[in-house]
């Protein structure tokens, strides 16, 4: 009994520390990717094309690394992989201090940061306890979202004081996360290493066994990300509001998401499979309706209400969807499988803005992008709704 209590305490301590590390790394990512490089064209000689390329390369590096990181963690062990990641992140962001307007350094740092964050995510997802998955995944996604947003806002404020003087803060945050890592005991599901050919075959096998999940993993991210390029224009040109009122809508959505992740996500635990199915299906349908409704709304107060509803639903849909995916994963392949899943999700988030921007540009109508996003959620609702209905008798 005492050993069990000690193990539970150790697991809880490790989980909390990993949450803090995830928060700090996402904080650094938010500072650099969402704030710093976006402001560079306005305060230095860096061209917008360079910062856009850096932004894209960051997420390409993130998604590509996720695809193989689970295998690398088991082949070289967590200490080597994570330490390498921290070195890459710290060194690349440290170089920004000395070369704040170097196109090569800006792109290189974005790529290295994308690689560095990947193993932390995979370890977090594979270390979640099954009987507390909904609750703990709520905490994981909350740490991710809070880190990104607070990092972005914090860097925005520092840039207003001076555009480049506080660049050292980004590498400092990574250094703190790096130090905290040495107080964590990370354990993988198994440590059996395989030859490269066997690992490639395993990637193919993992992919084939989870084809049912790929539409949801890929298209959810694509549908949401498709709206990113048009939302500022929608706010200022269609609803005719200031950037401050638009920011308030984003904040309201973020608050709704945070509340849901912290308090509603635990509803997923110890509930029937049908309840989980209902949350996922309701989420897809509600998203379809709300996104379609945005195309007809010109009142900012109604937009704020819709933003709150989207945030609340997102905060419980993510843990529910995560729990649904977890049921398909073999217990000894968690790192590899979560890595592949994260990679597919990353590619969805990359192609979404591309489609969203192209649809608006070639049709010259913002509403068509809303219709496109809503249609994706309709397709997901029909596809997975059919699966849930077919498997409802098996659900317990």
From Swiss-Prot:
Belongs to the major facilitator superfamily. LtaA family. The chain crosses the membrane at residues 15-34, 46-73, 80-99, 105-126, 138-159, 165-184, 211-231, 243-264, 276-298, 304-326, 338-358, 370-390. This is Proton-coupled antiporter flippase LtaA. Pfam families: MFS_1. It is found in: Cell membrane. InterPro entries: ATG22/LtaA_families (IPR050495), MFS (IPR011701), MFS_dom (IPR020846), MFS_trans_sf (IPR036259). Proton-coupled antiporter flippase that catalyzes the translocation, from the inner to the outer leaflet of the cell membrane, of the lipid-linked disaccharide (anchor-LLD) that anchors lipoteichoic acids (LTA) to the cell membrane. It comes from Staphylococcus aureus (strain bovine RF122 / ET3-1). Pathway: Cell wall biogenesis; lipoteichoic acid biosynthesis. It is a multi-pass membrane protein. GO terms for biological process: lipid transport; lipoteichoic acid biosynthetic process. Keywords: Antiport, Cell membrane, Lipid transport, Membrane, Transmembrane, Transmembrane helix, Transport, Virulence. GO terms for molecular function: antiporter activity. One of its GO terms (cellular component) is plasma membrane. It comes from the Bacteria. Its main location: membrane.
